[in-house]
Amino acid sequence: MADIGADCDLRALINPASIGEGVESLDKLFGEAGTVAVTKSDQPTGRVLASGTSEAVLHDVVEDLAHHFAVSDQLETALAVLVQFAPDPARPVRQCYGIMLQAMPDCDLEQFDDLRKRLLAPEVRSILEAGERDEDFASEVLNALTHDLDCSCQLYPGPAPVYRCGCSHDSSVA
């Protein structure tokens, strides 16, 4: 489960007990069936602005979320999530990174498909795995994706997401 607030605070939960020996990829953590639910709400009031659900038909949490945006919001979406697992069973997930690209109206869908394929290219992956998060991080990733393309890409000028969880340590490890 992941929760991202309107102020870009985010938290994500995963039960370490559900991670078996030798799990090396995110898709192996999830089962064969499920539902993707996305709710957009106004932070100060909590009023739901929009919500949607779709069947998790691809059996991969990342692909199912991209599929949700395509069928629910009619937006071509490319997602990439990289999870670095640690050998410590008490803290099995060392770091997690994600990128989401969405095609704007009148986007060249062939170029967008090319960007989708590049999301896990070695040059992009090396930037993500380096773990350096400064003000140039998003620009570096965007440049690695688009440096040789004739296209117009923009970074969303909003605030950077910050991991913040109000849960106590005891409830987080339970």
Could you tell me what each predicted segment is?
Residues 1-89:
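General detector of N-terminal leader/presequence modules that precede the first folded domain
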Residues 2-3, 12, 36-39, 112-119, ...:
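Generic hydrophobic, helix-prone segments enriched in Leu/Val/Ile
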Residues 8, 96, 107, 151-153, ...:
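Generic recognition of cysteine residues
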Residues 56, 103-106, 155-157:
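Generic structural "secondary-structure junction" signal
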Residues 64, 100, 137-140:
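Non-catalytic alpha-helical scaffold/packing segments enriched in small hydrophobic residues
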Residues 69-71, 76-133:
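Active-site environment of non-heme Fe oxygenases that use a 2-His-1-carboxylate facial triad
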Residues 116-174:
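Cys/His-clustered metal-coordination modules, chiefly Zn-binding fingers
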